[in-house]
């Protein structure tokens, strides 16, 4: 099922853990609508800007899958409102800065950020119906969360070490 021009339901629900453990990771109609909104409002503009495929490393998670991986059943992933992503060839911190300044989102987290490796970690981003998004921006270094994105050195619109 195509959710938007470049994103399918299959890639939004793919989970190696669900496959290995025989967990049904099929979303309901409400979650599918939320995934479609996420694709149109965040993922398509992101793909268009960088002109590169966006890799979804974690999308929808059923309650059973959340339990299997130690995630909360109330996670926005379980509502079809969140994805973890990367764009190969673009530092994750650069993608996070673009998202912060160019799309409406509920929560943006630069996960497992290491200032020595701007391409490391991954980006968690969530979206729900327009007008009710918190625009919360956090960085997680593997131990603690902090407000905002880390300051980086930029040159020519790109992050430099």
Give names to the regions the model predicted.
Residues 55-57, 82-86, 124-126:
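Structural recognition of the beta-strand scaffold that forms the well-ordered cores
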Residues 68-78, 113-116:
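Short, flexible, solvent-exposed loop/turn segments with mixed acidic/basic and small polar residues
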Residues 73-93:
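Acidic, His- and aromatic-enriched active-site or binding-groove loops in soluble protein domains
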Residues 87-161:
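Catalytic cores and adjacent binding grooves of peptidoglycan-active enzymes
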């Amino acid at each position: 099922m195509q959710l938007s021009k470049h994103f399918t339901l299959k890639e939004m629900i793919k989970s190696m853990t669900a496959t290995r453990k025989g967990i049904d990771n099929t979303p309901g109609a409400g979650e599918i609508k939320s995934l479609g909104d996420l694709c149109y409002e965040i993922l398509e503009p992101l793909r268009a800007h960088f002109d590169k495929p966006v890799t979804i490393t974690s999308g929808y998670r059923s309650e059973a899958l959340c339990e299997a991986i130690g995630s909360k059943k109330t996670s926005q992933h379980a509502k079809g409102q969140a994805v973890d992503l990367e764009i190969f060839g673009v530092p994750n911190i650069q993608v996070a800065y673009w998202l912060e300044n160019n799309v409406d989102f509920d929560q943006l987290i630069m996960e497992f950020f290491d200032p020595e490796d701007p391409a490391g970690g991954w980006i968690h981003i969530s979206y729900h119906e327009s007008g009710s998004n918190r625009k919360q921006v956090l960085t997680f270094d593997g131990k603690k969360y902090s407000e905002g994105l880390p300051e980086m050195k930029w040159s020519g619109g790109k992050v430099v070490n």
